Amino acid sequence: MTQIIPALDLIDGEVVRLVKGDYEQKKVYKYNPLKKFKEYEKAGAKELHLVDLTGAKDPSKRQFALIEKLAKEVSVNLQVGGGIRSKEEVKALLDCGVKRVVIGSMAIKDATLCLEILKEFGSEAIVLALDTILKEDYVVAVNAWQEASDKKLMEVLDFYSNKGLKHILCTDISKDGTMQGVNVRLYKLIHEIFPNICIQASGGVASLKDLENLKGICSGVIVGKALLDGVFSVEEGIRCLAN
């Protein structure tokens, strides 16, 4: 069954939203991250997603203390991402009580290290974030979306799915933080070619209709801005996906 996965992006402990990953286009929300996550959990969310934007910019400033507090205080699964560049960071996050760690650019830039991490921590602990841009084909972006790689999305998926990959988080960058609706076509395509991979859709969720369109295609739909802005609630999202 498709789950709604509420998401928070944090800079220095503050809840923020960026548009298309741009730190200059930042909106700060006056929410306490722990209270917000507890609210989402109480509403019925089974998984939560956290992006450490401080750590993404500077790994030496990763918000470990806050992440550990959040992981310990919520009883549902917490998944964390944000520019994770090393095996040590993955281990440290899992030691904090995080259920899954999201790794991105590393999958493209250092496949050897990425495979080592998959092998060492297991496919249930790792989510590959593949941020895509449509050129002539879907290609994977790296470096916090600032550049397109020469790697085609389907080729990357083919490579890793043969090496035991189970979970991906796929974002259509053109949609992220825009609330323009999700790219259903992209997720359908992945689901048809790689039926055994659990897809988390992210970017552009603007209405319950988007959730409805992804039902049965994705294992999870990450929702940030739409929940923070009160477009719909976690309860409404769960009901929509259950029907």
UniProtKB/Swiss-Prot annotation:
<keyword id="KW-0028">Amino-acid biosynthesis</keyword>
<feature type="active site" description="Proton acceptor">
    <location>
        <position position="9"/>
    </location>
</feature>
<comment type="similarity">
    <text>Belongs to the HisA/HisF family.</text>
</comment>
<dbReference type="InterPro" id="IPR011060">
    <property type="entry name" value="RibuloseP-bd_barrel"/>
</dbReference>
<dbReference type="InterPro" id="IPR006062">
    <property type="entry name" value="His_biosynth"/>
</dbReference>
<dbReference type="InterPro" id="IPR006063">
    <property type="entry name" value="HisA_bact_arch"/>
</dbReference>
<keyword id="KW-0413">Isomerase</keyword>
<comment type="pathway">
    <text>Amino-acid biosynthesis; L-histidine biosynthesis; L-histidine from 5-phospho-alpha-D-ribose 1-diphosphate: step 4/9.</text>
</comment>
<keyword id="KW-0368">Histidine biosynthesis</keyword>
<dbReference type="GO" id="GO:0000162">
    <property type="term" value="P:L-tryptophan biosynthetic process"/>
</dbReference>
<feature type="active site" description="Proton donor">
    <location>
        <position position="131"/>
    </location>
</feature>
<keyword id="KW-0963">Cytoplasm</keyword>
<dbReference type="Pfam" id="PF00977">
    <property type="entry name" value="His_biosynth"/>
</dbReference>
<dbReference type="GO" id="GO:0000105">
    <property type="term" value="P:L-histidine biosynthetic process"/>
</dbReference>
<dbReference type="GO" id="GO:0005737">
    <property type="term" value="C:cytoplasm"/>
</dbReference>
<dbReference type="GO" id="GO:0003949">
    <property type="term" value="F:1-(5-phosphoribosyl)-5-[(5-phosphoribosylamino)methylideneamino]imidazole-4-carboxamide isomerase activity"/>
</dbReference>
<dbReference type="InterPro" id="IPR013785">
    <property type="entry name" value="Aldolase_TIM"/>
</dbReference>
<protein>
    <recommendedName>
        <fullName>1-(5-phosphoribosyl)-5-[(5-phosphoribosylamino)methylideneamino] imidazole-4-carboxamide isomerase</fullName>
        <ecNumber>5.3.1.16</ecNumber>
    </recommendedName>
</protein>
<dbReference type="InterPro" id="IPR023016">
    <property type="entry name" value="Isoase_HisA-like_bact"/>
</dbReference>
<dbReference type="InterPro" id="IPR044524">
    <property type="entry name" value="Isoase_HisA-like"/>
</dbReference>
